[in-house]
From Swiss-Prot:
The keyword Protein biosynthesis does not apply. Residues 581-604, 1145-1172 are annotated as: Disordered. The gene is Rgs22. This is Regulator of G-protein signaling 22. Residues 1154-1164 have a biased composition (Basic and acidic residues). The lineage of its organism: Eukaryota, Metazoa, Chordata, Craniata, Vertebrata. GO terms for biological process: negative regulation of signal transduction. It comes from Mus musculus. Residues 845-973, 1014-1138 form the RGS domain. Keywords: Coiled coil, Cytoplasm, Nucleus, Repeat, Signal transduction inhibitor. InterPro entries: RGS (IPR016137), Rgs22 (IPR042651), RGS22_RGS_fourth (IPR048074), RGS22_RGS_second (IPR048075), RGS22_RGS_third (IPR048073), RGS_sf (IPR036305), RGS_subdomain_2 (IPR044926). Expressed testis, including in Leydig cells and spermatogenic cells from the spermatogonia to spermatid stages (at protein level). GO terms for cellular component: actin cytoskeleton; cytoplasm; cytosol; fibrillar center; male germ cell nucleus; nucleus. It comes from the Eukaryota.
């Protein structure tokens, strides 16, 4: 029978390891979130395990899901079974489906406030963690981790419990002391076989620096085949005490070597102890070989799945058979693996066990598939939910195993123990845990006395038999000491771990699942607690036995529903209770909605009046009370649900919150009790003690059989300890109250101490208010930031599917499954992907995509169609981060935080769709300092580089071959080269002018090398350069400066080649920068280059050296080159003597026209009285300009040009339009409109005549 070692030592969470546990242990996340949501704390916080951030509790997801369900129910057709009795009335309507209108965009986004990561972690450690480590939530978490070790197997399993085996401690080898510098240098010289001889100190130091850098360089090779590799890691783990070597994620490696025990395949299958990972691995199939004594033994094989191993092993067996028959050796092939030398096999992928032991939650697709037709079980939280208990039980049955691997199963186990002997072991273990953290001697002794009354005395509520007490050596009261109880705690755990937990697992076996009705009924009776027969049955009391002021009220659940059809903004949300909890007397213990409990979108802090009080769905209030306070039956129930306004007058809302806090004080780590103790006020401390002891007194009235002697004894104890004049814990009750209680103490009833209870509750209001205010003040120091989340809802997916009636449901489901499967493809199948790529495209690499903007855009769209664009976006963002200047720390920090929040969470990189395997994720987080670093704002740059490598690996080996083998890519490659060049030319006209996502254009505008040479020679020719300079001056304001800049840079290059003094070169650089890039004359940038290039030149002028102006000169060259063909056409019709005169004439005409336009703008703003002068100012410059052009052309041979004639007509049209616009604006509606119109018309006619005359002369 297989054996399994179990630990009796629970995990120990410390402040140093808290972040690592929180990032990896879902058990701890569940219990810590329950702790943070208790009514004791005014701010309800929860840890989102998917995003690794603490967030303010928000009910928006629940409200959204509720409305989605309502919409879906309204749009689904009515079941035809309801139309049986209504035949003929609604036949046409019975199967009609109300399809939602496509114009109505259903908004599933919601906003949530999150604590800033660094500040939030520090605040949690300082204000919440100490109390959590002393709370029942933490104790129960420790017990749950121990119980989760128990598993069930159909073939049986032998458990061995020990305290020297701790699977949850992160085993880290002690760091060796750093070697001395001399020893380190000696080892490097020995490794490289180098003797430095007569080298100087500087040369020696530089050489050692380079040698150390070469040692630290890691080469990442991406190979598509199985490669033998010599294992350099530590030897194979063989002993059972080292099975859980990473301390967090259990991984067992079964070794078949001589030093380890031989375990059968059935053992490995049933025990589940073969090494496996919880998420699909993206690693290559690699073989790690360990050398021992020069023989190739202990070969390690890594496979992505069991199926892949079986295929490879069957092929090996067939080859061996063929070799035996034919006599030909097949071991010479490179892919040959000798399985006779394999010591153990590691599987990177198995069907995901729905257990919270793993870092990665179950795949989203599996959860969606299971909950597709069960709307009531849809996950409403933003974090990844585990599979439901029934589904998980079905999965375990199909795999012939079962364990208590998550919080939900653990809660079922607690219910299974109700009324059994296992429950007594449970509470004894918990009481020992409580005893261990009590430091106050008085409270320590009081707790010991209560334990004796509960377990040792025969009338105790959880009395243990003499046999059990004798086994634990607790028969005598003197043995009930803290040290002895600590020593026997492991023995108390053994019955739970070795009997009750396996028995619970057995109930989920296949035989029990398929049992007959009688057997199921019998099993149900066994799970229920036994009820003792009461010979004197009690009568239900109709009136309450306690004042309303001492009972937590139940407000109505109020809240505004979120409109799903609004763009993105939400209204204020009223706080809603997380769930209805039951007190010992079956009174729901809910939160009190605050008057101003809304959280506005965009607000950075919660209002002071906001009080979020809630209990989680896992909290059982009957177990939150002390063991003596658990009430089995409720004889007094108030069926009237009270509203907020119905709260008793005693204290109002503060009293309600105080009562709720007191009822869960032990699960909150006695947070309020410690505040009262540390305040120094004895009355506050005594009042808290009295309230807890009073609940034990009330508990006696809710047992099945009333025991008058115990009631009388407890009443006398309370009176003597807290109320009597000489009481040791006097609560300060007034004399009349003491006398009244003394007169009614015989016989005692439940309402005997109601007066004292109201008195202490009123007195405790003051410390409660002080504690809440101080906690709020500390919380206000933490900065909040708003984040937008999207609800992952099956209802929304169904609604979205209703819009696509043309696509069949079956085809849609197949497509979705194929996409999900494709996005989670194994990297081990890289060879298959590349085999499907045509031979002509196999040379295509990811770098080629980056250099081809058109195909890069198609590749991005291809990934989006397969819902995998995150891979490319992640790679691009990290690449942009790497290219940010190191000195710009602020920008690098912002980009790093952005990458961390968007990609490094359990929705992508650390989730089921991660491009890295679980082992690779562990290596990356160990490189960053542990899994706790995921809770911080950013990771180191080296970690981001490693992440980028894994993302690039999947892009190159999975998505790129799929893209190259697609039909769309093949059809695009058949297009002519000329059409491709045109497409590239059009893409260059984009504003960013970048070929990739981050780097500038690489000479895509150049058509031929001959034209480049001709243009460069022209710019170096003083005459042609001067003509070209005047020509481009007509095209743009800064183009003329571009010619000068290009020439000055050429002179700077010649200066660098002359090997002159460095100061002269730096002076030249400064001159060029001051003239063209950072000019004192506005604008500062005098040439047509991007601002980013200018900024780079200013910041890196020293680092770039002689190449400081290289990119700027290339950009200017490209801009000017566009005008070179036009200039060549212009020179054809003119001689060299006439070129400058024509260009100067055009330049002067351009300046005059600009001045004319300026005057026209000024004239348009003038009043009616200044019309005549305005009209003159509009026409005179133009006429003067035209007459000047006539005089300048006088005496020359008149020529006529069609282009000039068209230009003159265009000018005439513009001037007439301006004139008409001025007239319409200035004189509409005036009495003198007709008289004033005549001179303006004459001016226009004269202007037209002059322009026409000038055109003819030209």
């Amino acid at each position: 029978m297989p054996e399994k070692r179990l630990s009796a030592e629970p995990p120990e969470v410390t402040e140093e390891e808290f972040e690592n546990y929180l990032a990896t242990d879902n058990f701890l996340v569940d219990y810590f979130n329950e702790f943070l949501s208790l009514p004791t704390f005014p701010e309800a916080i929860r840890f989102n395990v998917d995003y690794g951030v603490f967030e303010v509790v928000n009910d928006a997801p629940q409200l959204l899901e509720k409305q989605l369900k309502k919409i879906l129910q309204n749009q689904q057709p009515r079941n035809p079974i309801y139309d049986v009795v209504r035949k003929g009335k609604s036949d046409s309507k019975s199967t009609q489906k109300s399809v939602p209108c496509e114009d109505e965009a259903i908004n599933v986004n919601y906003s949530i406030m999150c604590l800033k990561r660094e500040q939030g972690i520090n605040w949690i450690k300082r204000e919440r963690l100490p109390a959590f480590l002393e709370s029942d939530c933490y104790f129960e978490y420790r017990l749950a981790k121990l119980i989760s070790q128990a598993t069930w197997s159909s073939t049986g399993m032998n458990f061995i419990v020990g305290t020297n085996f701790t699977p949850w401690i992160l085993r880290r080898p002690p760091a060796p002391p750093p070697p001395s510098t001399d020893e380190d240098n000696y080892m490097i010289m020995k490794k490289f076989y180098v003797s430095l001889g007569q080298a100087s100190y500087t040369q020696t130091k530089d050489w050692f620096t380079l040698a150390k850098e070469s040692e630290n360089t890691v080469t990442m090779a991406s190979l598509p085949c199985c490669i033998p590799h010599h294992q350099t890691a530590s030897p194979v783990i063989a002993t059972a005490s080292e099975i859980f070597d990473d301390g967090v994620h259990p991984r067992t490696i079964k070794s078949l070597s001589k030093s380890s025990k031989a375990v059968s395949e059935l053992d490995e299958e049933e025990e589940g102890s073969i090494s496996m990972k919880d998420s699909p691995s993206q690693a290559l199939l690699r073989v790690y070989l360990e050398k021992k004594g020069g023989k190739e033994r202990n070969l390690t094989l890594h496979f992505s799945s069991v199926e892949e191993f079986l295929d490879a092993y069957i092929i090996f067996i067939l080859r061996e058979a063929i070799q035996h028959i034919t006599g030909q050796s097949l071991s010479d092939t490179p892919e040959y693996i000798n399985y006779y030398k394999v010591s153990h096999v590691i599987f990177d992928k198995v069907p995901p066990v729905p257990s919270n032991k793993a870092i990665v939650s179950p795949p989203v697709e599996m959860v969606e598939e299971i909950s597709k037709d069960r709307l009531e079980n849809v996950s409403l939280s933003s974090e990844s939910e585990s599979i439901g208990p029934e589904s998980r039980a079905d999965w375990c049955i199909s795999h012939r195993t079962y364990d208590i691997g998550n919080r939900r199963e653990f809660e079922r186990f607690k219910k299974f123990l109700k009324g059994t002997l296992g429950e007594r072991y449970w509470w004894l273990w918990m009481d020992i845990e409580r005893l261990k953290v009590l430091k106050d001697p008085e409270r320590h002794q009081r707790h010991l006395e209560k334990m004796k009354k509960c377990y040792l005395v025969s009338s105790g509520e959880r009395y243990l038999s003499a046999e059990i007490l004798s086994k634990f050596k607790l028969l005598h009261g003197s043995r009930w000491t803290a040290d002895h109880l600590k020593n026997i705690q492991a023995e108390v755990l053994k019955p739970l771990l070795l009997y009750w937990a396996p028995r619970f697992c057995v109930t989920h076996s296949a035989s029990a699942k398929n049992a007959s009705t009688e057997l199921k009924f019998w099993r149900l009776r066994q799970e229920k607690p036994r009820k003792d027969v009461d010979p004197f049955p009690q009568m239900a009391t109709l009136l309450p036995l306690r004042p309303k002021s001492c009972i937590p009220q139940t407000p109505e659940v109020q809240g505004e529903e979120i409109n799903l059809f609004q763009p993105s903004k939400f209204k204020k949300l009223s706080k809603i209770n997380a769930g209805t909890q039951q007190l010992g007397r079956s009174e729901p213990l809910n939160a009190v909605s605050s008057k101003d409990g809304g959280l506005e979108k965009g607000s950075k802090r919660l209002p002071e009046s906001t009080t979020v009080v809630r209990l989680t769905s896992f909290t059982d209030i009957s177990e939150c009370l002390k063991p003596q306070l658990e009430r089995k039956y409720t004889y007094t129930e108030e069926h009237n649900v009270k509203t907020v306004s119905n709260v008793g007058a005693l204290g109002g809302f503060d009293m309600e919150n105080l009562l709720q806090s007191l009822y869960v004080e032990n699960r909150a780590g006695f947070f309020f009790t410690k505040f009262c103790e540390n305040s120094g006020n004895k009355l506050w401390k005594h009042s808290v003690y009295f309230w807890f002891d009073l609940q034990a007194y009330h508990q006696l009235f809710y047992q099945e059989t009333l025991q008058p002697f115990k009631v009388c004894k407890q009443a006398q104890y309370l009176f003597a300890t807290y109320i009597a004049p000489s009481a040791s814990f006097d609560i300060g009750l007034h004399q009349e109250g003491k006398k009244d209680i003394y007169m009614k103490i015989q016989p005692p009833f439940e309402d005997l101490f109601d007066t004292a209870e109201e008195f202490i509750l009123l007195s405790l209001l003051e410390p409660w208010t002080q504690m809440v205010m101080s906690d709020k003040m500390a919380y206000k120091k933490v900065e909040l930031q708003e984040e937008t989340r999207q609800l992952d809802s099956a209802c929304f997916r169904k609604l979205h599917a209703l819009h696509k009636e043309t696509i069949s449901k079956k085809a849609e489901d197949t497509t979705g499954y194929a996409m999900a499967k494709l996005s989670l493809s194994d990297v081990s199948k890289q060879t298959e992907y590349w085999l499907n790529v045509p031979e002509g495209y196999k040379h295509f690499t990811f770098t080629d995509l980056l250099n081809n903007k058109l195909e890069f855009e198609h590749f991005r769209q291809f990934l989006e169609s397969h819902s995998s664009s995150l891979d490319l976006m992640c790679w691009i963002d990290i690449e942009q981060f790497r290219r940010i200047i190191f000195k710009d720390q602020k920008q690098r920090e912002e980009k790093s935080i952005y990458i961390k929040n968007k990609y490094l969470n359990k929705k992508y990189f650390f989730g089921p769709r991660s491009p890295a395997s679980l082992h690779q994720q562990n290596q990356i987080m160990l490189l960053s300092g542990g899994w706790g670093r995921i809770l911080h704002e950013q990771l180191d740059a080296s970690v981001l580089v490693e992440i980028q490598k894994h993302v690039l690996n999947r892009l190159e080996n999975v998505w790129l071959p799929l893209f190259l083998s697609s039909e769309q890519f093949a059809s695009r490659q058949k297009i002519k080269t000329q059409m491709k060049d045109i497409a590239d030319e059009l893409l260059l006209q984009r504003h960013d002018r970048k070929i990739g996502v981050w780097k500038p254009v690489e000479s895509k505008w150049i058509s031929s090398s001959c034209e480049i040479i001709a243009f460069r020679k022209a710019l170096l020719n003083p005459v042609i350069a001067r003509q070209f300079q005047r020509f481009v001056a007509l095209k743009g304001d800064l183009l003329e400066n571009g010619v000068l800049f290009w020439q000055e840079v050429q002179k700077f290059k010649d200066l660098c080649h002359s090997h002159c003094d460095e100061s002269i070169i730096h002076k030249k650089i400064t001159t060029i920068i001051n003239c063209f890039i950072n000019s004192y004359i506005p604008p500062a940038l005098q040439i047509d280059i991007p601002v980013e290039q200018a900024q780079k030149i200013l910041e890196h002028r020293k680092e770039l050296g002689p190449y400081v102006f290289r990119e700027a000169q290339m950009t200017i060259f490209g801009v000017l080159f566009k005008f070179w063909p036009q200039f060549c056409e212009f020179r054809k019709n003119l001689t060299d003597e006439k070129i400058m005169s024509v260009l100067e004439r055009r330049q002067e005409h351009k300046q005059k026209r600009k001045a004319s336009d300026t005057e026209e703008d000024k004239a348009g703003k003038s009043g009616v009285k200044q019309y005549a002068s305005t009209t003159g100012s509009l026409t005179k410059p133009v006429l003067g300009s035209e007459s000047l052009l006539v005089l300048q052309s006088y005496g020359r041979q008149p020529t006529w040009c069609y282009s000039k004639y068209i230009e003159a007509l265009e000018q005439e049209r513009i001037l007439l339009k301006i004139q008409e616009e001025v007239e319409r604006k200035m004189f509409t509606g005036t009495s003198s409109f007709t008289n004033l119109l005549k001179p303006s018309t004459g001016s226009a006619l004269s202007l037209k005549k002059n322009v026409s005359l000038h055109s003819i002369q030209r």
